[in-house]
């Protein structure tokens, strides 16, 4: 019995680790920019301490030297998958019953490449929770993460039309609540994208800070979703008036439904001469450029830089999908 229990626990832990995920790609008005302007975390593991600076943009992130160009009022589509570099729809975007809300914030910064996330953030999107009349517990209800899984990891986010132009960080986040019944159990999966927004707006939305916007005891963070639920209090501020929401349980639309890797338009960003970031476009990498420490250097379908900066080595982190300079 003891050996069975240990084996069962080991299997559960393995399943838990396999279900971790990362926001790792971006579409802009249906054009695939891949992972060129995302700060990829060092792993697909979650942040659990809401008081840590890691709650801003995750742990050990690389900072690309490029920024994705976005017009105010356009739609970007964030994309999440369990394994780095794997954009297949064969697996859930975030598995293991990791149910919870999906939220997106933006932060106006002087330079999206160097910004550390300490400036204020405003929420521009959320897809949280809706009651399933046929269900008995929160597990049965509709959640933002279930919508992610239904849409191959994709979720459409409107960039507010009235915000002032300039550089922004866009922070995409999932809060997984499957073990959130005890303090510190909620799991936060986030990535920050580096954007340059163009337009003629002048709005400067009110902001919150990370850390600070969340408390470990917030009712939407400290919660038992395995019991019947009649309501859910979404963490953080309300969505900015120029942003958008999606009703949990609704169908895929726009790029969520139609954008397919390799079968539509894609874009390659021009790298500075001191390239430190790999690109996902054909001909944009290989041995002729250098990837900075913690950046991708190989994996299935990868065509970017394969040589790592001095002091780091290209290591298979999640073979065959993803190799990283470590």
From Swiss-Prot:
Use in biotechnology or industry: Lignocellulose is the most abundant polymeric composite on Earth and is a recalcitrant but promising renewable substrate for industrial biotechnology applications. Together with cellobiose dehydrogenases (CDHs) an enzymatic system capable of oxidative cellulose cleavage is formed, which increases the efficiency of cellulases and put LPMOs at focus of biofuel research.
Signal peptide: 1-19
Names of required cofactors: Cu(2+)
Binding site for O2: 178, 187
Subcellular location per the Swiss-Prot or TrEMBL entry: Secreted
First-tier enzyme category under EC: oxidoreductase
Biased amino acid composition, Low complexity: 265-281
Organism domain of life: Eukaryota
Protein name (Swiss-Prot/TrEMBL): AA9 family lytic polysaccharide monooxygenase B
Free-text note on domains in this protein's UniProt record: Has a modular structure: an endo-beta-1,4-glucanase catalytic module at the N-terminus, a linker rich in serines and threonines, and a C-terminal carbohydrate-binding module (CBM). The genes for catalytic modules and CBMs seem to have evolved separately and have been linked by gene fusion.
Keyword presence, Signal: yes
Similarity field: Belongs to the polysaccharide monooxygenase AA9 family.
Residues annotated as binding Cu(2+): 20, 98, 189
Reactions catalysed: [(1->4)-beta-D-glucosyl]n+m + reduced acceptor + O2 = 4-dehydro-beta-D-glucosyl-[(1->4)-beta-D-glucosyl]n-1 + [(1->4)-beta-D-glucosyl]m + acceptor + H2O
SMART domains attached to this UniProt entry: fCBD
GO cellular component, one term: extracellular region
Alphabetical list of PANTHER family matching this protein: ENDOGLUCANASE II, PUTATIVE (AFU_ORTHOLOGUE AFUA_1G12560)-RELATED
This protein's encoding gene: LPMO9B
Xref: Pfam families: AA9, CBM_1
EC number, as in UniProt: 1.14.99.56
Region (Disordered): 265-286
Alphabetical GO biological process terms: cellulose catabolic process
